[in-house]
């Protein structure tokens, strides 16, 4: 299982939200480039970045910082937030983004997903953010009537190979992920599933690993000191080699 440390960008700074609430945001680091370098030093093989300004406005706002991070750290980066059209996807892939995450656009524009997957295959991921098992969009401000598993199955039929699943009620809480929903999703589709939201300690990571989940995104637990990234990566890799 791969551990992806998270950087959420707002106005050029690293912040963390609580349950997806932009009003409950807290700056955790002034310099995201320094954070990314620290993640690399601690053994990260992949970094998860969200442009929160982009998620709200529908267009990437922190591209210069993101581009600099890619050039500086030289490890794969996946990016979500405000990616709504093929031109933006093209631009991001050209800029060196390894995997582009579509969220709102995937729900509102199935045609875009089809075109993107046809062109970029596994470089496209779908971010499914759920509230009470329903898919939320537009920076989590609006909740649809679509069940998260039904949506994941639909994406799989299109050819999507990577799904990032977040239970919004758990995100930023350090109260543990929604293991029940994660398990159901992982058993319902054959895509790579990446767990996100609420992961609080190494024990959570071990449980997710046992579910045969492809990856886990860790944010607040690293910034709060609950998880030592270097130690977590070593432990999970050791478990993988058993």
From Swiss-Prot:
**Where is this gene product found?**
Cytoplasm
Biological process per Gene Ontology, one example term: L-histidine biosynthetic process
Cellular component aspect of the GO annotation: cytoplasm
Matches recorded under Gene3D superfamilies? Aldolase class I (3.20.20.70)
Q: In which pathway does it act?
A: Amino-acid biosynthesis; L-histidine biosynthesis; L-histidine from 5-phospho-alpha-D-ribose 1-diphosphate: step 4/9
User: Which InterPro entries does this entry report, sorted A to Z?
Assistant: Aldolase_TIM (IPR013785), His_biosynth (IPR006062), HisA_bact_arch (IPR006063), Isoase_HisA-like (IPR044524), Isoase_HisA-like_bact (IPR023016), RibuloseP-bd_barrel (IPR011060)
Does the keyword Transmembrane feature in the UniProt annotation? no
Residues of the active site: 8 (proton acceptor), 129 (proton donor)
**Main subcellular location:** cytoplasm
Q: Which UniProt keywords apply?
A: Amino-acid biosynthesis, Cytoplasm, Histidine biosynthesis, Isomerase
Catalytic class of the enzyme: isomerase
Amino-acid biosynthesis as a keyword of this entry, yes or no, is: yes
Q: What is this protein called?
A: 1-(5-phosphoribosyl)-5-[(5-phosphoribosylamino)methylideneamino] imidazole-4-carboxamide isomerase
**Origin species:** Clostridium botulinum (strain Langeland / NCTC 10281 / Type F)
Lineage per the UniProt record: Bacteria, Bacillati, Bacillota, Clostridia, Eubacteriales
Q: Which gene encodes it?
A: hisA
């Amino acid at each position: 299982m791969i551990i992806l440390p998270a950087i959420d960008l707002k106005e050029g700074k690293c912040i963390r939200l609580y349950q997806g609430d932009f009003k409950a945001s807290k700056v955790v680091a002034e310099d995201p480039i320094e954070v990314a370098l620290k993640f690399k030093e601690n053994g990260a093989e992949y970094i998860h970045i969200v442009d929160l300004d982009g998620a709200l406005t529908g267009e990437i706002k922190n591209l210069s910082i993101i581009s600099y991070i890619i050039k500086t750290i030289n490890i794969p980066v996946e990016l979500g937030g405000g990616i709504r059209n093929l031109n933006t996807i093209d631009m991001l892939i050209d800029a060196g983004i390894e995997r582009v995450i579509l969220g709102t656009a995937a729900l509102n524009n199935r045609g875009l997903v089809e075109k993107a997957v046809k062109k970029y295959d596994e470089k496209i991921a779908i971010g499914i953010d759920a509230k009470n098992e329903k898919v939320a969009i537009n920076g989590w401000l609006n909740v649809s009537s679509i069940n998260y598993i039904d949506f994941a199955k639909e994406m799989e039929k299109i050819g999507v190979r990577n799904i990032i699943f977040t239970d919004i009620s758990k995100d930023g809480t350090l109260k543990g992920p929604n293991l029940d929903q994660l398990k159901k999703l992982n058993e319902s589709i054959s895509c790579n599933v990446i767990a996100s939201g609420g992961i609080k300690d190494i024990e959570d990571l071990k449980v997710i690993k046992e579910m045969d989940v492809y990856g886990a995104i860790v944010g607040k637990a690293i910034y709060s000191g609950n998880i030592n990234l270097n130690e977590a990566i070593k432990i999970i890799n050791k478990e993988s080699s058993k």
